[in-house]
Amino acid sequence: GLGDVYKRQILQDQYNLLDCLLVGTVLNTFINNSHVVKIACMAQLVNVIPAISTVKNGISWRQSVYYPLYFASLYGRGESLQLKINSPKYSSDIADDVNYVDASAVINEEEKTLSFFIINRSEDESVDLDFDINNLPIIKIIDQQIINHTNIYASNTINKPNEIVPKKTNIATFQKENLIAKIPKLSYLFILLKIK
C-alpha cells in the first residue's frame, strides 16, 4: 500500500572519499567566488541525499561529505583571500591545464585566524605545497587535519561509521616565511593558523 512507499529509504546515498573531495572543491569554489556567491546552503542534511545518515531506532553517522561542510561552516567565515596556485596539472574531456591542487583561504580578523582548505586531486602523486605568507602576521599552526584513505570508494556506514574521518596531522610546517607540506594523493587538508 501507500504506507510502504513512505517506509522505503529513498535517495539515501552512500558517499565515499571521492564525494568528499568533490564537496570540498565545490566549497572552495564558493569561497573563492564569495564576492559573487553571498550564501550557499546544503538543502538535505539527514537521510535524503545526506550529510548525516540514520536508521530507525539506531545510530546516526556522518557521511564523508559532512566533513568539508563542517570545516567550511566553522572556519570559512571572514574574508576570502585570492590564492595564486601553481601545481602540477592534468587535462580532461572538458578542460585543459587543470591544477591538481584546489584551495581556498579565509582570514578572520575577529578570531585572528587564517584557514586553508586544500584538496589534492591527483590519483597518483603527492603534491608539494608551498604558500608564501610573508605579508601575513602568522603566530603558529593551531590545527591541521587530513581526510584520505587507501580506498577511494571507502565510505562511512552503519557498521563502519568512522571509515572516512578527519585525522590530526602535522604535515604542514613553516620554513622561513612559507607554509609547506607534502599533500598525499586524493586528500583533503584543513589548516588553521593563528595570526596577530
Task: Give a label for each model feature.
Residues 1-6:
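Short, small-residue-biased leader/transition segments that mark boundaries at the very start
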Residues 8-20:
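The substrate-binding groove and active-site-proximal loops of carbohydrate-active enzymes
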Residues 19-27:
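Short, hydrophobic/amphipathic alpha-helical packing segments
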Residues 26-30, 39, 91-92, 101-106, ...:
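Generic recognition of flexible, low-complexity loop/linker segments
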Residues 27-44, 49-95, 190:
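Catalytic cores of secreted or luminal carbohydrate-active enzymes
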Residues 97-138, 144, 149, 186-192:
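Carbohydrate-binding surface patches
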Residues 137-183:
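Acidic, Ser/Thr/Pro-rich beta/coil linker or hinge segments at domain junctions
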Residues 176-196:
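Beta-strand-rich recognition/accessory modules
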